[in-house]
UniProtKB/Swiss-Prot annotation:
Biological process according to GO: translation
Description of how the protein assembles with itself and partners: Part of the 50S ribosomal subunit.
UniProt region (Disordered), positions on chain: 74-94
PANTHER family: 50S/60S RIBOSOMAL PROTEIN L16, LARGE RIBOSOMAL SUBUNIT PROTEIN UL16M
Designated name of the protein: Large ribosomal subunit protein uL16
Function of the protein: Binds 23S rRNA and is also seen to make contacts with the A and possibly P site tRNAs.
GO cellular component, one term: cytosolic large ribosomal subunit
Lineage, uppermost ranks: Bacteria, Bacillati, Actinomycetota, Actinomycetes, Pseudonocardiales
UniProt keywords, alphabetically: Ribonucleoprotein, Ribosomal protein, RNA-binding, rRNA-binding, tRNA-binding
Domain of life according to the entry: Bacteria
Coiled coil spans: none
Recorded family membership: Belongs to the universal ribosomal protein uL16 family.
InterPro entries from the UniProt entry: Ribosomal_uL16 (IPR047873), Ribosomal_uL16_bact-type (IPR000114), Ribosomal_uL16_CS (IPR020798), Ribosomal_uL16_dom (IPR016180), Ribosomal_uL16_sf (IPR036920)
Length: 139
């Protein structure tokens, strides 16, 4: 699982869900990628689940790049607890993803297999995504 090694503060403010991605909107390493269409938080478990979906479908011969990292703690209060008495304890780590962000990249010689692998990974993510390629743009 992806988690930060060290953080300056145990809890943080909730990230804003507005605006568009400033960087990371183009494919840098691979030939194909998954691009976010809407805002959302992606947890470390969802990132790992999408990575496994890609690697199991392409088996060998492909390379996967993960361009997002869960650097924000998500806090939650215990069940059946009254409101008040401070913020809840950190439960998981999330990456704040804005529209236009390329989250995963894949380099694989067969286009049909690469698109199918990325489609399977996109189903694991909590927001609407589209598959993009380096030359053609989106599919």
């Amino acid at each position: 699982m992806l988690v930060p090694r060290r953080v300056k503060w145990r809890k943080s403010h909730a990230p804003k869900r507005k605006g568009f991605a400033k960087g990371g909107t183009r494919i840098n390493f691979g030939e194909y990628g998954i691009q976010a269409i809407e805002h959302g938080y992606v947890t470390n478990r969802q990132i790992e689940s999408a990575r496994i979906a890609i690697t199991r479908h392409v088996k060998r011969g492909g390379k996967v790049w993960i361009n997002i990292f869960p650097d924000r703690p998500l806090t939650k209060k215990p069940a059946e607890t009254r409101q008040g008495s401070g913020k809840g304890s950190p439960e998981s780590w999330v990456a704040n993803v804005k529209p236009g962000r390329v989250m995963f990249e894949l380099n694989f010689p067969n286009e049909k297999t690469a698109i199918e692998a990325l489609t399977r990974a996109a189903h694991k993510l909590p927001m609407k995504c589209k598959i993009v390629s380096r030359e053609a743009g989106d599919f």
